[in-house]
């Protein structure tokens, strides 16, 4: 909401669920407890927004980025709904056994959750940097597109170069373990983002710890450091992976434990030759990755698919025309008050 409000005047905040992390791992029980406690107030806030803003908006098409409120709104009013997210790739595509090896429980749990969250959308657009085959029964209602990138990243492509630092973005790992490992790689400088948070209770880290330069977050500074780095060390989130690949940066991925989507992304990075994945921050493996970074960079230039922005716009326009009849039926009935 805060990000979109900078670009658009009429943005309504719909609150959602959150994930709790403990020592670099998704805390399943803690996540469940936190969301159960927060659910009543979230529901009240969202219902208020529904009556005050959304009903009067009278949309003809609903798009949801893995958000249940928008999905339920569309179902309630008989509106066409298009899912645009990266999670659906887990259920709607086939994945080789090596992608699921050792994490099959997380895979099954994640798949069940995704299936239950947004069933029966009119179409699913999946953002991804890899292209597994779509399951036969889903082919007519599923489209894969490249990562969707913000304008600042697209502009940074023009000035991107290989500098003398490695960009690190890690919010879930232990700061001590990460910094200790990075300092073992003494022949590189690391620009570290994500370790200074507004809500942190411990004393803030100094500006420099050995060969690690601790950065306060700013969008301009982060994009510049990303565009001029040698390589990226990050978790397995799709957003930064997509941005780094677009700028030609190899990635050393340390996915958050118990989050299958991140593990999957890290393993596909390795399969495609765009970088390495590791369950932990391992200094020796990081040294190997950095020695071979030019090999990974060459693979990215050769194999990475184009950005998905323009293709997404074309697909959405096409879907809007296709579902126009359904939208008109809903408009004739009028939006329901509850």
Protein language model features and the residues they cover:
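Donor-nucleotide binding loops and adjacent catalytic segments primarily
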Residues: 148-228
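Short acidic-hydrophobic, aromatic-tinged amphipathic segments that line or gate anion-handling sites
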Residues: 13-14, 213-217, 275-283
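Nucleotide-sugar donor-binding patch of glycosyltransferase catalytic domains
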Residues: 99-100, 202-205, 250-296
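Active-site-proximal region of nucleotide-activated glycan assembly enzymes
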Residues: 77-144
């Amino acid at each position: 909401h805060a990000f979109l409000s900078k670009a658009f005047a009429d943005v309504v905040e719909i609150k959602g669920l959150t994930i709790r992390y403990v020592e670099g791992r998704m805390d399943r029980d803690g996540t469940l407890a936190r969301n159960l406690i927060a659910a009543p107030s979230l529901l009240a806030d969202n219902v208020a927004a529904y009556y005050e803003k959304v009903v009067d908006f009278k949309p003809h098409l609903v798009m949801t980025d893995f958000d249940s409120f928008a999905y339920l709104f569309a179902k309630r009013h008989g509106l066409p709904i298009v899912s645009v997210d990266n999670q659906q790739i887990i259920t709607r595509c086939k994945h080789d056994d090596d992608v699921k090896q050792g994490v099959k429980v997380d895979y099954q749990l994640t798949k069940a959750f995704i299936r239950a969250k947004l069933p029966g959308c009119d179409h699913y657009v999946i953002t991804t940097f890899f292209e597994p085959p779509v399951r036969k029964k889903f082919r007519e209602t599923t489209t894969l597109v490249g990562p969707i990138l913000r304008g600042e990243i697209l502009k940074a492509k023009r000035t991107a170069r290989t500098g003398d630092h490695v960009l690190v973005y890690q919010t879930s790992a232990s700061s001590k373990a990460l910094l200790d490992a990075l300092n073992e790689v003494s022949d590189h400088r690391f620009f570290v983002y994500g370790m200074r948070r507004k809500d942190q209770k411990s004393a803030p880290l100094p500006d420099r710890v050995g060969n690690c330069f601790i950065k306060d977050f700013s969008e301009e500074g982060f994009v510049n450091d990303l565009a001029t780095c040698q390589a990226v060390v990050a978790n397995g989130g799709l957003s930064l992976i997509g941005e780094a690949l677009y700028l030609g940066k190899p990635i050393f991925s340390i996915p958050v434990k118990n989050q299958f989507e991140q593990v999957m992304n890290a393993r596909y990075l390795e399969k495609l030759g765009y970088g390495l994945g590791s369950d932990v921050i391992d200094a020796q493996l990081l040294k190997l990755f950095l020695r071979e970074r030019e090999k990974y960079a060459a693979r990215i230039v050769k194999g990475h698919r184009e950005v998905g922005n323009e293709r997404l716009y074309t697909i959405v326009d096409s879907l809007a025309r296709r579902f126009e009849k359904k939208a008109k039926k809903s408009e004739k009935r009028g939006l329901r008050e509850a």
